[in-house]
Structure formats: C-alpha cells, structure tokens
C-alpha cells in the first residue's frame, strides 16, 4: 500500500480547520477537549485513507474473513495507539509543540471506551490488533455500550460506583453506519402459514422490535497500513415516540420503544441476581447474535 508522508504544515492546518468546523472557534479559543476532538478527526482522516485501501485490497484478493465475536472489547485509548501504529506519533507531537500544544495533555482528554471489563475484553482487543498487524482480513463484532461497567470513586472511605458516560462528548474514532441497520424482534408468537406453492412459512406476530445500528471503529495494524474493523451494535427504537399515547396521558407507553432499546445497551453484564436482570442479559445476548 502507498506510504503515508507526514506533512507538518498540512497537519496543523487540518487541526485548525477541524476546530473551526466542529466548534466555530479558533485554536486559541478551543478547550483541551475540543482540541482533542480536532486532533483525533485529523488522525482519523489519515486512517480512513488506509481503511479504504485495505477494503479495496481485500475485495480484490477475496481472502477468508475472520469474525471475532465478543460481548466485550477492552480497546483502551485510541488516539495515541493509532498514531504509534501509523508511525506518526513523534511527528504529530513536534507539530503540536510548534503551536503551543502538549500532546500528553491532549491524550488525557480521551475517555477509555467502556466496551469491556477485564481479561476477556483485553484478549479480544489484542487479537484484533494482532490480526491487523499480521495483515489478516478480520472483523470484530460487539455491542456499543453507553456506560460499559462503571467508574470508581472513593467517598467517606468507601468505593462508590457511578456510570461511566464515555460518549458524553461524542467519540471521534467511530463511524455510524445506518445503511446496515437491522430489525431485531422480541416476544410475540409464531404462526405457520402454507403458501400457494405448498410451502410452510412462519410469521412472527405481536412482537416488540428494536433497530440494531452498527458503528465502525478502525483497528490499525502496526506500520503496514492495514486497517481492520470493529463493528459495534447500538440499539435504537423503531419508533422513537408515540404521540398518540402521549396525547392520551400514557407517557410511559409513549417512550416504551425507546426504553426497550436503551436498556439493551446501557451496561455490560447487567446485574442478574433477579428475574428482570436475567431477562435483560438474555435479550442483550439475543440482540447481539441477531445483529
């Protein structure tokens, strides 16, 4: 694949342009979080060139594709890791220093993607990066948790668990792919119907459904311009809001579909020491394998 040549002046201009387009600010006015977003989008532009080239190469070669399915991927922060794998970390650091920016402070603005918890998630992440570094055609498949597990705080000498809202500022290293969305159905019943050709067809009725919407995250191989894909699925309501129910005063039913979708992807491994938790885990796993 074509070798990327780092252009310091162009990189700095792209960062400034991203700050302007994303936040309607100059670089001097931007916060550290906003600068992190702008730098990340600039790096992602470099990644996307390799991502497209990788896809074209795989389409031409038609290799066997590896699909790594896991309920969790503990990926870690992406900005620094991606720059290292692109072999541009030193150049970016020096370019940012020229305009008075500290790369270490910028990297500290990135939240850990709350897509995993422990050994299983870290193993999945390592496998995906190894596959990309070795040049294998691979997809990771998981769930886009909104809060993952939790953040730990110490209050009055005791651990307190609070939600880890890693998506509150948006995440620059993901691409929403609504064109690949699928309907996932829950509940109801199945009836059999015989067609005119004499074939039996099974039809699911009186079900609840959500829309499984994929987000692509790049998995950058080290120094080889190969970019594989981690596809994580979010759950969205088929109909966000039932105005008729709302007008009748049934406010709970008005947002029932939205609540069903949100519950599926709120947290990794929801508490299952009660019936509702067991049902949610089963629905979560069914949603994943269906998508």
Where does each model-flagged region fall?
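A conserved ligand/cofactor-binding region detector
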Residues: 1-291
